[in-house]
């Protein structure tokens, strides 16, 4: 089993608190609205706090799959949200899980900066570039889609 990591960051015009709320507390409602492939987000275990497991169902080219998203930690005071993708038909077969440690920092002009550390826990000793790049693209797409929703809905 190997562990492969990368870090990324994304600037946003949206303030920390507002974007954090959209990316965490309200994400179950927002994400299916802004990402066409996501059909549903449902809690299958827990109450929304650490330990909660969500089933995220998506459709890609007529094929439906799902991932299990486990909340590892939420800290509203420091704008930190840690979670893992721990299973499901949408998790690449080469992976045991993917862990995410995210934090929103104060950014320029009232905005924020999203920082994320991603660790791929592989079943073998290799992580393909395709798997890593696809996960990175999906993460960036999700962040930008939720940010776009908040910017388009000023009364959010």
From Swiss-Prot:
<feature type="binding site">
    <location>
        <position position="38"/>
    </location>
    <ligand>
        <name>Ca(2+)</name>
    </ligand>
</feature>
<feature type="binding site">
    <location>
        <position position="133"/>
    </location>
    <ligand>
        <name>trans-zeatin 3</name>
    </ligand>
</feature>
<dbReference type="GO" id="GO:0010427">
    <property type="term" value="F:abscisic acid binding"/>
</dbReference>
<dbReference type="GO" id="GO:0044373">
    <property type="term" value="F:cytokinin binding"/>
</dbReference>
<protein>
    <recommendedName>
        <fullName>Protein LlR18B</fullName>
        <ecNumber>3.1.27.-</ecNumber>
    </recommendedName>
</protein>
<dbReference type="GO" id="GO:0009738">
    <property type="term" value="P:abscisic acid-activated signaling pathway"/>
</dbReference>
<dbReference type="GO" id="GO:0038023">
    <property type="term" value="F:signaling receptor activity"/>
</dbReference>
<dbReference type="GO" id="GO:0004864">
    <property type="term" value="F:protein phosphatase inhibitor activity"/>
</dbReference>
<feature type="binding site">
    <location>
        <position position="136"/>
    </location>
    <ligand>
        <name>trans-zeatin 3</name>
    </ligand>
</feature>
<dbReference type="InterPro" id="IPR050279">
    <property type="entry name" value="Plant_def-hormone_signal"/>
</dbReference>
<feature type="binding site">
    <location>
        <position position="28"/>
    </location>
    <ligand>
        <name>trans-zeatin 2</name>
    </ligand>
</feature>
<dbReference type="GO" id="GO:0004540">
    <property type="term" value="F:RNA nuclease activity"/>
</dbReference>
<dbReference type="InterPro" id="IPR024949">
    <property type="entry name" value="Bet_v_I_allergen"/>
</dbReference>
<keyword id="KW-0020">Allergen</keyword>
<keyword id="KW-0963">Cytoplasm</keyword>
<keyword id="KW-0611">Plant defense</keyword>
<comment type="function">
    <text>Class II ribonuclease (RNase), with low activity on single-strand RNA. Binds to cytokinins. Interacts with melatonin.</text>
</comment>
<dbReference type="GO" id="GO:0005634">
    <property type="term" value="C:nucleus"/>
</dbReference>
<dbReference type="GO" id="GO:0006952">
    <property type="term" value="P:defense response"/>
</dbReference>
<dbReference type="GO" id="GO:1904408">
    <property type="term" value="F:melatonin binding"/>
</dbReference>
<dbReference type="Pfam" id="PF00407">
    <property type="entry name" value="Bet_v_1"/>
</dbReference>
<dbReference type="GO" id="GO:0005509">
    <property type="term" value="F:calcium ion binding"/>
</dbReference>
<keyword id="KW-0378">Hydrolase</keyword>
<keyword id="KW-0479">Metal-binding</keyword>
<keyword id="KW-0540">Nuclease</keyword>
<feature type="binding site">
    <location>
        <position position="8"/>
    </location>
    <ligand>
        <name>trans-zeatin 1</name>
    </ligand>
</feature>
<feature type="binding site">
    <location>
        <position position="54"/>
    </location>
    <ligand>
        <name>trans-zeatin 2</name>
    </ligand>
</feature>
<dbReference type="InterPro" id="IPR023393">
    <property type="entry name" value="START-like_dom_sf"/>
</dbReference>
<feature type="binding site">
    <location>
        <position position="32"/>
    </location>
    <ligand>
        <name>Ca(2+)</name>
    </ligand>
</feature>
<keyword id="KW-0106">Calcium</keyword>
<dbReference type="GO" id="GO:0005829">
    <property type="term" value="C:cytosol"/>
</dbReference>
<keyword id="KW-0568">Pathogenesis-related protein</keyword>
<dbReference type="InterPro" id="IPR000916">
    <property type="entry name" value="Bet_v_I/MLP"/>
</dbReference>
<comment type="similarity">
    <text>Belongs to the BetVI family.</text>
</comment>
């Amino acid at each position: 089993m190997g562990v492969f990591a990368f870090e990324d960051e994304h600037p946003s015009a949206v303030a920390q608190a507002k974007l954090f709320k959209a990316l965490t507390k309200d994400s179950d409602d927002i994400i299916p609205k802004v990402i066409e492939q996501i059909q549903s987000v449902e809690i299958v275990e827990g109450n929304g706090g650490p330990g909660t497991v969500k089933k995220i169902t998506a459709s890609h080219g007529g094929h439906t799959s799902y991932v299990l998203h486990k909340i590892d930690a939420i800290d509203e005071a420091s704008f930190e949200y840690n979670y893992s993708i721990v299973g499901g038909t949408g998790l690449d077969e080469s992976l045991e899980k993917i862990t995410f440690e995210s934090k929103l920092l104060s950014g320029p002009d009232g905005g924020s900066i999203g920082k994320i550390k991603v660790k791929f826990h592989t079943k073998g000793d290799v992580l393909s570039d395709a798997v890593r790049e696809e996960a990175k693209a999906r993460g960036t797409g999700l962040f930008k889609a939720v940010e776009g929703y908040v910017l388009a809905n000023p009364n959010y």
